[in-house]
Amino acid sequence: YASTGIYVDLPSVSEDRAEISVRGTLVNRDVRRAVLKLDVEVLDTDGKTVAQSLRSVRIDADGAFAFEERLQLEKPQLWSPDSPYLYSVKVSLKDVRGKVLKDEPRVPLGVRWFSVDAQEGFKLNGEPLKLMGACRHQDQMPMGIALSDEMHRRDMQLLKDMGVNFV
């Protein structure tokens, strides 16, 4: 599957704090060593930086550098089916003057935790949640599987109207 090459995990989440792990590999295909700044930011829905890691990296000529940055997010806005809040994790490579090189990949991030217990069932963010599931096939006549965004949104709204919270 295609991806940005940026991997985001949540090793620890609570109502008070979320620990965010951001991993990736930087590759230098140049014949010279690269001295760069790696900037990892967590942005809220307004684009405001709410957590950041900034450090210098050196990558040898025709070399690679694997990184893992750990960020702390205080009092995170938790994701849930009723409040599907998404942060955005942005990774930038900058030259020594601070100019952004190439692209700045962004990865959506929903901060949440869950647990499953035989007696208490499924909990999302510490609250019981009854999973109401359905299967969805993404096809419609005469489009086949080439659905527009509007068609996908309509399908999701129909599922939500049916009480589905798990697809």
Give the label of every model feature segment.
Residues 1-167:
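Secreted/periplasmic carbohydrate-active enzymes, especially glycoside hydrolases
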